[in-house]
Amino acid sequence: VARPVIFVLAGVNGAGKSTAGERELTQAGLTWFNPDTFTRQLIKTTGAPPAEANAAAWQAGVRQLDAAIAGRTDYAFETTLGGNTIAAKLREASKTHDVLMWFVGLGSPEHHLARIKLRVSRGGHDIPETKVRERFESSRRNLIALLPYLSQLQVYDNSVDATIGQPMP
């Protein structure tokens, strides 16, 4: 009997997680929880301030992950992997699930910050510089600590920028 799967699309803000993973996951028939998308929906439907909507989206994602672990069901989600909560839950999930991760990274915090600045110039959301710098280190520490618990890991260096509409380098 196949074990249920927890699929994790991880990486620091601005790494290109959504861009790199959305098409592949959708083509594979997976619906996944993207906290940024959920935050935008909450702001639009409830008028909640961005910080409040972001916190609610994060909590919703954690509840869904908890439900998938408890119910032994498949779940796919996106995370920065910057904090301790998700890493602990993935260790727990590995007891009953195959935990598969795609980790999308860039070579420096400065590159993440430049990508975020570009995203903001196009109407996207900003992330404080201190958070990006913290997550650059903590996400890698969490990734290394999770290695024994992952059934599969693919790491993507997304440092080469591509022009929209052009083939990926």
Q: Which residues fall in each region the model found?
A:
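Glycine-rich phosphate-binding loop used to anchor ATP phosphates in small-molecule kinases
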Residues: 56-104, 139, 146, 154
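P-loop (Walker A) phosphate-binding loop of NTP-binding proteins
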Residues: 12
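Conserved glycine(s) of the Walker
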Residues: 16
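A glycine- and Lys/Arg-enriched "phosphate-lid" helix/loop adjacent to the NTP-binding pocket
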Residues: 96-142
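Short hydrophobic/aromatic beta-strand immediately N-terminal to the Walker A/P-loop
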Residues: 6-8
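Phosphate-binding P-loop
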Residues: 1-4, 68-69
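NTP-dependent small-molecule kinase module
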Residues: 145-169
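Conserved substrate/cofactor phosphate-moiety recognition/catalytic segment
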Residues: 19-73
